[in-house]
């Protein structure tokens, strides 16, 4: 480490090892598990999977041990589990996944903050789960273990039989690779090359993934990280292991040849909301949602599994909440997390958060706070009450408006469904009503305030079109329910906000993955169009006349210095705006008032009339002397961006020096073209110059309205989604608006419509029943406690149910905030009758904390 420093930069180096000591032993243990090899007789042969694919009844399958290992990482919210994943990904070659899209994107955001990271898939995508498996009839077959306690082979067979409808389809699809010429031979070619070059086996296997980019991730590594694993049902543990062995047996990978086994690193909290499983009974037209044992509880509580996995030596517990800065509140959350005894002191602290239930349910109170409820019905009721209140309150900021959402039902497949499901008398309206939660996002369908559906039959296209109007609130906080394409076309915030965007590379990181040139070109466009905001600010009459004159002089001098660096102005020249030459051939400005000029004689252009009324000082020389061209090469693009960025930062410094915070917090808007609004509708002449990006569930958005402006990048959506031509034709006729969202940084974007296929499975029939088209957003003003898990919310007001209280739900709800100052509750759940639904998991956790073999990370 250098001890010297120059005048510009300090050369001292600081290394952060604060968390490394606790994580180092985890890395060592995971590496040991991953490097352990099996004898040949323990490796599941390819013939096992070929034979399994021929069985119609999975109960007849041979009970076989599918070897695997698990390292468990548990802990409460904000304790450092994600940081541990980041360290593991940096040091080990591993496959990182999440249980849901939100979990995957959360961990992606964590990784991409430090370095460039590929997108993180869900564990379902990695093991081969497809869209047509969503409607699979799980549990169609059942296997009863013959011994008590059951052996590991029996536990695995029980899970495989339960999940066989999905695993059977995945197995048959994977075995088709054997029939292709290059499928399983991809690694054989590399092995031949290793033999020719005299290299050890596996030395060049990494080249395979560079040559064949479409290889399944399971062929690359045997270390699989699953974030938020507590949301997975227990049978998925074996399903993942089964698919790993299947994939590697088919491709004959180096790790399969070496006898390596899959190592699952399960990360999460076993004491939060339960894993849920849903099935649809066509005979009763009813969707059944039931609680199932999650993977973490299964691993911790099942004695056979604990012994097989040697859990005590393969378990790390993170026990400190680093998000919460209040020790007393953090202690309360820890008590709820681990099921520790609740004291009177804890109860008295919770008393401080209690307010009347009517106070929380009144939309006039706690504006901007997120309401959490136990049921979707309560959420829907509050949203209706909120919308009614806003309609009559006269609030100009939070305005209520409605947008149409559509469902296109295939009449032919609907008739086939009625026959297959033995429902000859079911109507379209009834079918739509009972399947609302399956057609779109479950929470979205239950929570939103929507009108009664209206149906229209179009016999020529063979379609029934269902339409309902959904109510939204302008300027409210929303989240997208799935990953959607968006077209970023502007910025709306403050000067200070935009400066932070320029100083921080986060925008370039998140939007420059495809081509960084697009991101720089877009920012240059906003910089050029938004530079006039500095001069607009100076038009305020409340500003000091002397400060305004000084600002005009300094802005003009700065602009000329940057645009014409070869023109060396003396210090005296820089003091007077009159010394700066405005090119008259570009501007034609006379500098006289309109009243002094004969308009008909002196002006041929209306713009000249307008500008002649301005004082010379009001003219931004940038627009007179610089033509914003379309830079082509990378160097030209960055040079243009660098020049405009330098000018913006220079102007910002001048204005802050003269006007302070009053300027920096003033509004700064810039768009790729002229933008105006009327009510909730936004008008923009042309979207050209914007850039394509993705709207993620992990981002926070503000609903700014809607627009009918055409976005060319979205025109191929029906083709990309493989929507039937007649549906695409009708969708085009309806001309659905595009919603406009502002992200947490201030960037404005038009978000593509959320278009999805709905495929119904009835016995052995797969029917393409419907196509849905909505906006893919849900409000953050109110949601269920279960939906809030994993979200960080600034201000929360909770309405607990008065009966059936579960401490796991109480913990999830209360731990959404980082400060107890922004927490309100209708009751004190610690003083009410409550229960635990965690299968005595707390006792196991407390025992683990006392176990010297379990690794504790503070």
Curated annotation (Swiss-Prot):
Enzyme class: hydrolase
Top-level taxon in the UniProt lineage: Viruses
Predominant location category: host cell
Molecular-function annotations in GO: ATP binding; helicase activity; hydrolase activity
Gene Ontology CC annotations of this record: host cell nucleus
Family matches, as InterPro entries: DNA_helicase_dom, HSV_HELI, P-loop_NTPase
Catalytic activity, EC: 3.6.4.-
GO biological process, one term: DNA replication
Residues binding ATP, per UniProt: 75-82
Localization in the cell: Host nucleus
Keywords: ATP-binding, DNA replication, Helicase, Host nucleus, Hydrolase, Nucleotide-binding
Family label: Belongs to the herpesviridae helicase family.
The protein's role, per its UniProt record: Component of the helicase/primase complex. Unwinds the DNA at the replication forks and generates single-stranded DNA for both leading and lagging strand synthesis. The primase synthesizes short RNA primers on the lagging strand that the polymerase elongates using dNTPs. Possesses helicase-like motifs and therefore may act as the helicase subunit of the complex.
Assembly, per entry: Associates with the primase and the primase-associated factor to form the helicase-primase complex.
Protein name, entry field: DNA replication helicase
């Amino acid at each position: 480490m250098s001890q010297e420093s120059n005048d510009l930069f300090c050369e001292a180096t600081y290394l952060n090892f604060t968390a490394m000591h606790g994580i180092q032993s985890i890395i060592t243990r995971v590496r040991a598990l991953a490097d352990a090899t099996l004898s040949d007789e323990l490796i599941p042969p390819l013939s096992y999977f070929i034979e399994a694919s021929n069985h119609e009844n999975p109960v007849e399958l041979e009970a076989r041990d599918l070897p695997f290992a698990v390292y468990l990482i548990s802990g409460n919210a904000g304790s450092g589990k994600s940081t541990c994943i980041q360290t593991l990904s940096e040091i080990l070659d591993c496959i990182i996944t999440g249980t849901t899209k939100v979990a995957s994107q959360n961990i992606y955001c964590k990784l991409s903050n430090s370095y460039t990271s590929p997108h993180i898939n869900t564990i379902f995508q990695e093991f081969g789960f497809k869209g047509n498996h969503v409607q699979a009839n799980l549990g169609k077959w059942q296997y009863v273990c013959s011994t008590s306690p059951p052996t590991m082979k029996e536990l695995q067979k029980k899970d495989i039989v339960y999940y066989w409808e999905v695993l059977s389809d995945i197995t048959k699809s994977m075995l088709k690779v054997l029939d292709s010429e290059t499928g399983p031979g991809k690694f054989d070619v590399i092995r031949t090359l290793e033999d020719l070059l005299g290299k050890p086996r596996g030395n060049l296997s990494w080249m395979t993934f560079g040559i064949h980019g479409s290889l399944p991730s399971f062929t690359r590594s045997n270390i699989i990280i699953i974030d938020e694993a507590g949301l997975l049902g227990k049978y998925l543990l074996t399903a993942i292991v089964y698919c790993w062995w299947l994939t590697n047996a088919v491709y004959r990978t180096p790790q399969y040849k070496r006898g390596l086994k899959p190592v699952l690193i399960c990360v999460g909290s076993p004491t939060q909301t339960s894993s849920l499983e849903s099935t649809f009974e066509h005979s009763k037209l009813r969707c059944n949602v039931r609680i199932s044992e999650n993977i973490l509880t299964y691993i911790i509580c099942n004695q056979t599994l604990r012994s097989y996995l040697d859990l005590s030596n393969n378990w790390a517990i993170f026990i400190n909440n680093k998000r919460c800065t209040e020790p007393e509140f953090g202690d309360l959350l820890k008590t709820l997390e681990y099921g520790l005894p609740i004291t009177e002191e804890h109860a008295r602290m919770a008393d401080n958060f209690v307010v009347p239930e009517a106070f929380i349910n009144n939309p006039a109170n706690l504006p901007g706070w997120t309401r959490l409820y136990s049921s979707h019905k309560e959420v829907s009721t509050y949203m209706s009450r909120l919308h009614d209140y806003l309609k009559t309150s006269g609030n100009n900021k939070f305005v209520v408006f409605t947008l149409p959402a559509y469902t296109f039902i295939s009449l032919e497949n609907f008739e086939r469904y009625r026959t297959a499901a033995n429902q000859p008398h079911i109507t379209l309206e009834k079918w739509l009503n009972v399947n609302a939660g399956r057609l779109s996002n479950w929470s979205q369908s239950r929570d939103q305030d929507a009108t009664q559906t209206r149906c229209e039959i179009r016999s020529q296209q063979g379609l029934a079109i269902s339409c309902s109007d959904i109510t939204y609130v302008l300027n409210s906080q929303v989240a997208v329910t799935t990953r959607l394409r968006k077209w970023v076309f502007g910025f709306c915030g403050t000067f200070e906000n935009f400066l932070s965007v320029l100083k921080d590379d986060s925008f370039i990181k998140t939007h420059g993955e495809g081509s960084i040139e697009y991101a720089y070109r877009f920012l240059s466009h906003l910089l050029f169009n938004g530079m006039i905001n500095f001069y607009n600010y100076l038009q305020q009459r409340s500003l000091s006349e002397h400060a305004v004159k000084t600002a005009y002089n300094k802005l003009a001098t700065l602009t000329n210095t940057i645009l014409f660096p070869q023109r060396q102005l003396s210090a005296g020249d820089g003091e007077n705006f009159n010394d700066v030459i405005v090119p008259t051939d570009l501007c034609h400005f006379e500098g006289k008032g309109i009243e002094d000029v004969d308009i008909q004689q002196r002006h041929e252009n209306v713009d000249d009339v307008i500008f002649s009324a301005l004082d010379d000082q009001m003219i931004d020389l940038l627009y007179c002397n610089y033509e914003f061209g379309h830079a082509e090469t990378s160097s030209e693009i960055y040079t243009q961006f660098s020049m405009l960025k330098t000018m913006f930062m220079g102007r910002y410094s001048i204005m802050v020096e003269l006007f302070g915070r009053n300027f920096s917090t003033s509004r700064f808007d810039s768009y790729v073209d002229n933008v105006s609004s009327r009510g909730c509708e936004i008008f923009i002449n042309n979207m050209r110059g914007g850039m394509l990006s993705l709207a993620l569930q992990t981002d926070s958005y503000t609903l700014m309205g809607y627009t009918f402006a055409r976005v060319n990048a979205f025109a191929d959506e029906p083709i990309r989604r493989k929507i039937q031509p007649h549906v695409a034709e009708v969708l085009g006729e309806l001309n659905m608006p595009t919603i406009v969202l502002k992200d947490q940084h201030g960037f404005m974007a038009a978000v593509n419509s959320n278009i999805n296929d709905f495929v119904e499975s009835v016995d052995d029939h797969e029917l393409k029943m419907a196509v849905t088209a909505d906006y893919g957003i849900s409000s953050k003003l109110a949601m269920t406690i279960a939906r809030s898990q994993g979200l960080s919310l600034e201000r929360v007001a909770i309405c607990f149910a008065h009966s059936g209280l579960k401490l796991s739900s109480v913990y999830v709800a209360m731990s959404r905030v980082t400060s107890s100052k922004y927490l309100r509750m209708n009751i004190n759940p610690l003083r009410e009758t409550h229960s635990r639904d965690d299968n005595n998991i707390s006792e196991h956790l407390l025992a683990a904390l006392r176990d010297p073999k379990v690794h504790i990370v503070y």
